[in-house]
Swiss-Prot record:
Record-linked PROSITE patterns: ABC_TRANSPORTER_1, ABC_TRANSPORTER_2
GO BP annotations listed: transmembrane transport
Keyword Acetylation: no
Spans traversing the lipid bilayer: none
Residues reported to bind ATP: G66, P67, N68, G69, A70, G71, K72, T73
GO cellular component: ATP-binding cassette (ABC) transporter complex
Domain (ABC transporter): residue spans on this chain: 34-266
Key words, A-Z: ATP-binding, Nucleotide-binding, Transport
Name of the protein this chain belongs to: Uncharacterized ABC transporter ATP-binding protein R00382
Disulfide bonds: none
A GO molecular-function annotation: ATP hydrolysis activity
Family according to the record: Belongs to the ABC transporter superfamily.
Length: 270
C-alpha cells in the first residue's frame, strides 16, 4: 500500500487564499488517521529503521510485529515520541507531530500505555484517574461525572477506594486504560500489552483492545506474543531488517512465505 505524501510548501512566498483552502481540505482528508511516512533511524553508522511507512485509522487495531532486532521497537518509540526521528514524518489527524514531545502529542489525541506498570502506586484507584482529569478539565462536576463513567465502563467502581498498588495485573491494566481515556485520545499506542501475563489476563487485554476500537479509537500494538496479537488485530505490519517486509490481514501475514521463512517458522498457526 502506498501512502500519499502531502505537498511541501515553498518558503518565502505568502500563501494565497486558494492555497490555504487547499491545505485545509488536505488536512481534513487525513482526519482520523495516524500516518508515519518514511521513518528512518540510525545509531552511529548502523541504520536500524529504513523508510518505514504505516497507517492507523480510527476504530481499527494494527500490529507492528517482527523478530528481535528488526527495528520495530525503535519505530514504535519514534511514533510515541520517545525516540527522535532522523528522517521521515509522523502525522496525527493531519497535524505534523514529528518533532513534538510526548505531552504535545497527547494533547493532539495520542494515548500511550507502556509495558511497565504506570499507575500512581501511592494513590487510590479513583485518584489515579482524577489526577489526570484535573489537568485536562477545570470543571469539577464534569470531572467527577467522567470519573464515575470511566470507573463503571471498566468495571472497577468497586475498587475506587482501593490503593492502586493492591490491584491484580488485570485490574491494573483496566485502571491504566481508563486513566489514559480520561484525555479522550483518538489513538492508543500499546507497548507489549501481553508481556508476562497469564492466559486469563490475555483474554482480558484482548477484550479491552476490542472495547477501545468499538469506541472509535485507533490502536497500534507492538508485542512479541505474535499469536495473541494476530488474533486480535485488523491488520499488521511485519518489520524485518529495519524495513516493512509486508503488511495485511492476519491470514495474509500467516500464509506469506517470506514471513514464515524469516519470522514465524513453518509450524506456526493461529
Amino acid at each position: 500500500m502506498q501512502i500519499p505524501f502531502l505537498h511541501k510548501r515553498k518558503r518565502g512566498k505568502k500563501p494565497s487564499a486558494a492555497a490555504a483552502a487547499a491545505r485545509a481540505v488536505d488536512k481534513a482528508r487525513y482526519d482520523g488517521t495516524l500516518i508515519a511516512r518514511g521513518l528512518t533511524k540510525s545509531y552511529r553508522s548502523r541504520r536500524v529503521v529504513n523508510g518505514v511507512s504505516l497507517v492507523v485509522r480510527r476504530g481499527e487495531a494494527v500490529g507492528l510485529l517482527g523478530p528481535n532486532g528488526a527495528g520495530k521497537t525503535t519505530c514504535f518509540y519514534m511514533i510515541t515520541g520517545l525516540v527522535p526521528v532522523d528522517e521521515g514524518s509522523i502525522e496525527i489527524n493531519g497535524n505534523d507531530v514529528t518533532t513534538m514531545p510526548m505531552y504535545r502529542r497527547a494533547r493532539l489525541g495520542v494515548g500511550y500505555l507502556p509495558q511497565e506498570a504506570s499507575i500512581f502506586r501511592g494513590l487510590t484507584v479513583e485518584d489515579n484517574i482524577r489526577a489526570v482529569l484535573e489537568v485536562h478539565d477545570e470543571n469539577v462536576d464534569r470531572r467527577e461525572s467522567k470519573l464515575n463513567d470511566l470507573l463503571g465502563e471498566f468495571s472497577i467502581t468497586h475498587l475506587r477506594k482501593s490503593p492502586a498498588i493492591a490491584l491484580s495485573g488485570g485490574e491494573r491494566r483496566r485502571l491504566e486504560i481508563a486513566r489514559a481515556l480520561a484525555t479522550d485520545p483518538t489513538f492508543m499506542l500499546l507497548d507489549e500489552p501481553f508481556a508476562g501475563v497469564d492466559p486469563i489476563s490475555v483474554a482480558d487485554i484482548q477484550a479491552l483492545v476490542r472495547h477501545l476500537t468499538s469506541r472509535g479509537i485507533g490502536v497500534l500494538i507492538t508485542d512479541h506474543n505474535v499469536r495473541e496479537t494476530l488474533g486480535l488485530i485488523d491488520r499488521a505490519y511485519i518489520i524485518h531488517a529495519g524495513e516493512v517486509l509486508t503488511h495485511g490481514r492476519a491470514n495474509d501475514i500467516v500464509t506469506n512465505p517470506d514471513v514464515r521463512r524469516l519470522y514465524l517458522g513453518d509450524n506456526f498457526s493461529l
